[in-house]
Amino acid sequence: MENNIDTQLELAISTRNTYNESEAELYIGYSSEKSTWQLLIRYNDDISDLVERYRMQIYYLLAGYAIIEISEAYLNAFAADPRIIYIDKPKSVEQQVSYAQYASCLSGTFINNYGLDGDGTIFAIIDSGIDYRHNEFVRDGKSRILSFWDQQAVYQDTYANTYKLGRIYTNEELNSILDGSYAGILPSEDRSGHGTQVAAIAAGTNIGVAPQTELLVVKIGSDTASKLPTTLGLILGIDYAIRTGIEMNRPISINLSYGNN
């Protein structure tokens, strides 16, 4: 195989015929029904001809990255093109909040000595979701969440988004949920409570470090086969957050309390 292919991807392809359930992590991103891989790539120049030649699905990210779905039969030929710098397979991610608190210099008792409250900024939480009804994310009966992208929701053209994944709830929709006038499908719950905890520590109305910031929430999607949150959902969330900050011309901070090492 080409040397720009992730070694885990090489191993997965070479051992797939001997697959067993204990190695599910290795095959994250592979669809046995379609014999395709969902992958993260880094590339140079225009690759639209490769998209057509290898019948790929592609979503272009910022800074020369993209997420593709490609048939395994075409992978080596695609990787051999000099415009393809690197190909990485998705990996699972796990909840990790304790080290994030340590790295942020947050102890059990936090005192804000700087007079900074996040006013005028956006705080993005890419995690397990959020309890959007919690009073830490509501002020004067209105949601402080600018948007909530539930990657695990069923995608519908009625509520189309550029990623063709999940459902993005607007601030107006969240407000109508709070006042009881919303008649649509509700966002999925934060069953683990991890994202809600992270958001409250960082930006809760009453207890947060930045109580005046507005929130952008992404609930990370899961791999179809393993049901595990993956790096692809994480990367899409980062892309969405950065694009939102650029579009609104506002500074944005991104919290990632998920990881895999």
Model-derived features with residue positions:
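Short, well-ordered amphipathic alpha-helical segments that serve as non-catalytic structural scaffolds
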Residues: 236-240
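Short acidic, glycine-rich surface-loop motifs adjacent to enzyme active sites
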Residues: 241-261
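Subtilisin-like serine protease catalytic core
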Residues: 111-232, 247-253
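Ligand-binding face of N-terminal immunoglobulin V-set domains in extracellular IgSF glycoproteins
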Residues: 68
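Short, flexible loop/turn elements at secondary-structure junctions
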Residues: 45, 72, 91, 130, ...
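Autoinhibitory N-terminal propeptides
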Residues: 1-63, 76-112, 135, 223
